[in-house]
Each structure stands twice: as C-alpha cells, then as structure tokens.
Amino acid sequence: MAQAVADFEALPDDASRAEFVEEPPLIGDAAWDAAIAALAVHLCRLGNFDRTPEWTRAGERYSPRIAWLTLPPESTMQAFVYQRTPIYFKARGVMLDEANLVSV
C-alpha cells in the first residue's frame, strides 16, 4: 500500500491521479477488495479531490467481517492498530496501521 501511495504522489498531474484511482476489478477476497477501495479514498484525500469515486462506495467494497491485514488474528497489538487505522479503512472493516501507508 505504501508503494501505491508513493506512486500516486509521484504522478505529474490531476488527470494522471484521477486515472490511477479508476475502478479496478474485484479480486474476490472481501478484505482486499475493501482495502483497495479504502486506499483509493485515501489517495483522493491526498490529492485533494472534490469527491471519491462512486465505485469505492459499492457494497462489495466493504468487508463483511473485520480484517486485520498486517497482524495475526490473535495479536495483542489489535487495540493499537485499531486506534491508528484511518476511518475510511475502519468503515470498510479493514484494520491497518496508518504507518503502512507511508514509504520510508
């Protein structure tokens, strides 16, 4: 995800950024389909878009159960990661430390 953010930020203009967040096909894993939509929302906020793409609000872009993308299911770090998950990921049932969205 951090690489996608870095790639987005390196794009030269708004038209290229808008193309970057066009709807991708569903991959068939509810958690990752939701994560991709949340990432698109994150990128739209970074790019100061007026609105997010309609596809990011489709029902199949929400996970039916909580998904911890960067933690084992029984990790003691869940509370910490939950606190640091951006709201547009939480809203889709995807828990991901905001640090996973930054390249170092």
Kindly label every feature range from the protein language model.
Residues 1-41:
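Helix-turn-helix/homeodomain-like alpha-helical modules used for DNA recognition
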Residues 44-104:
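Charge-dense, extended regions
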